[in-house]
Curated annotation (Swiss-Prot):
Cofactor: Zn(2+)
The protein's annotated pathway: Pyrimidine metabolism; UMP biosynthesis via de novo pathway; (S)-dihydroorotate from bicarbonate: step 3/3
Family note: Belongs to the metallo-dependent hydrolases superfamily. DHOase family. Class I DHOase subfamily.
Domain of life, source organism: Bacteria
Species, as recorded: Mycobacterium bovis (strain ATCC BAA-935 / AF2122/97)
Name of the featured protein: Dihydroorotase
Positions annotated to bind Zn(2+) 1: 57, 59, 151, 304
Reaction it catalyzes: (S)-dihydroorotate + H2O = N-carbamoyl-L-aspartate + H(+)
Cofactor stoichiometry and binding remark: Binds 2 Zn(2+) ions per subunit.
Amino acid sequence: MSVLIRGVRPYGEGERVDVLVDDGQIAQIGPDLAIPDTADVIDATGHVLLPGFVDLHTHLREPGREYAEDIETGSAAAALGGYTAVFAMANTNPVADSPVVTDHVWHRGQQVGLVDVHPVGAVTVGLAGAELTEMGMMNAGAAQVRMFSDDGVCVHDPLIMRRALEYATGLGVLIAQHAEEPRLTVGAFAHEGPMAARLGLAGWPRAAEESIVARDALLARDAGARVHICHASAAGTVEILKWAKDQGISITAEVTPHHLLLDDARLASYDGVNRVNPPLREASDAVALRQALADGIIDCVATDHAPHAEHEKCVEFAAARPGMLGLQTALSVVVQTMVAPGLLSWRDIARVMSENPACIARLPDQGRPLEVGEPANLTVVDPDATWTVTGADLASRSANTPFESMSLPATVTATLLRGKVTARDGKIRA
């Protein structure tokens, strides 16, 4: 079946046009297109058309913790949030450190069919940091794993990290680093600063992140490798990234929506929903991250969508599992922090939420231009809408959103994966 999107503005620019999607591709773009007899018509008058979003950093919890999330519920949240591809991190149970697990995740994603689910393979066996996994076998499997990370923990041994970068270069795959020097964060739950001191919480210094980013930039330089930095959170990290890029080092980085909007003032409530890794930092860090995203020092937005069940969050702060939901709120938070103040345009949103992450992960069919003949992986956005976040109403199996009861701008009105409508007007289209 073909789909006709009526009255939309590609990238939020120019006059309103109609976009006809047929056979999984953009077939026509122009004003007042004829409606095919079998077309599914989407009235998107005045809405913005963007390439489907790509999330380099999600936790779908399958296998092992399906009580918090699984690939079906996570895919639904992704589609409703405008995503057409997500990367599922390896810290599952069992760990995704072999083709048995990565191929299972891939096949489950294909079975659900709402987004392309790309499994991330572990860098080290069991995330233990001691022995490299068989990256080549995972890359050669059905999932064709193209990104590897021990996210949740840092590959802290510099020799192991150097070998991983060398190995990855030979395979043409990417290492994504959770930048945290573990010896600086023992027992830490909050950003090291006045707020943590006042609340009596052990502090997590910026240097724990910055030192690993600097080290891995140098290792990538010497190995001639690419390295990607997960969830940048500190102003100092921005300076290191800028220096590394100026040196010609092949380093990329992501920032989460929650680090763009929130800061450690939230911790005063001792609410476990605000515990996240890396921690919410000071307002000055959030300002630096926003500017870095606008300037291209930080390449993309990634959600670090991390569902946790109520019994894992509704506990004392130190006992709460770190992580926040992000897939359905990401666009709105980015609009509030970046578009509303004029730091990014809608075309820039396409760059940081679709084109750049697709390029980093080397996905040939995602993040493509809105042109005739291109794959119809598309997101339609109502830029003028507002909505109030209610965790219980989100598609995730968990409800641990830090944006509970917030009024946020912009809504996703439709998502198309290879021409198939996967989400429309807040509902999943199976």
